[in-house]
């Protein structure tokens, strides 16, 4: 299920959200969205039939660290007015992954031909928001300079089940000097709607993670000399829950290819 890493276009880094979505919708941009539309919230996406939506909502409510719900759509409605007045979820994500009966079947760049009147969209906060806050504080994130994203891993940490939905906690890893790790914990704790504080610091083996084995080969596994790995809950956890629950049909964003919204990152800070 590993997807090739798409080309990143740094010329869009200062684009506003509308320009980014238009580039995705009309110009066929299919790359990672990290660094695009600085200052604005990006969202993980999961789209399910309405018959599965209530159990999935309960799963999100029971697991707010990996599933910090920003909004859900009305049934059959491709808009998300809480995030922007001009989002069309069928076209505005760079890459989508489609699952049937829990199995990944294809990756596409447009889901208009897959859209149904019974679908409900869930949008979750994304760690790209707190990454901006870390950078604003002077904490370096090397992977961004290399046009990459944080490493993604399947841990052995559990989530709380809801109906058919359960999953191991998917995590992202960023490495820091001890001093910067302390500051990163303080900063990200201010952003519970984009995964909040870390779930683990230090030895990856304690949470069942091998840094050489990334989920879908996504992200940078590097831990620099004198640095320690720090792990955050990841918005790909719902994708794993879907794979275990095996609904007949589901659509998610592809890893690190998010929905760019009109919400300000600063609006999600709690203090």
From Swiss-Prot:
NCBIfam families: PRK05463.1 (NF003969). Keywords: Lyase. Belongs to the D-glutamate cyclase family. The keyword Repeat does not apply. GO terms for molecular function: lyase activity. This is Putative hydro-lyase OCAR_7359/OCA5_c07590. Its EC number is 4.2.1.-. It comes from the Bacteria. It is an enzyme of class 4 (lyase). Pfam families: D-Glu_cyclase.
